[in-house]
Amino acid sequence: MIVLGWMFFVGLVCYMGTFPELMPPTLKWQERWPVQESKTQLRRRALGEDLLQNHVEGI
């Protein structure tokens, strides 16, 4: 259980990019959030266009 907790902590630290104690409340992942949103929107648009093309073609 201790090993799983340590692995979770290290994974969280790697995800945020640094240790929480060394950073102010604005963490690096919050700075990258708009980039992630734009990627998600592009993916949704691409999927939506594919679905529309498939629907029009009758597939």
From Swiss-Prot:
Keywords: Membrane, Mitochondrion, Mitochondrion outer membrane, Transmembrane, Transmembrane helix. The chain crosses the membrane at residues 2-22. Coiled coil: none annotated. One of its GO terms (cellular component) is mitochondrial outer membrane. Signal peptide: none annotated. Isoform Kastor and isoform Polluks are conserved only in mammals. This is Mitochondrial sheath formation-associated protein. The gene is MISFA.
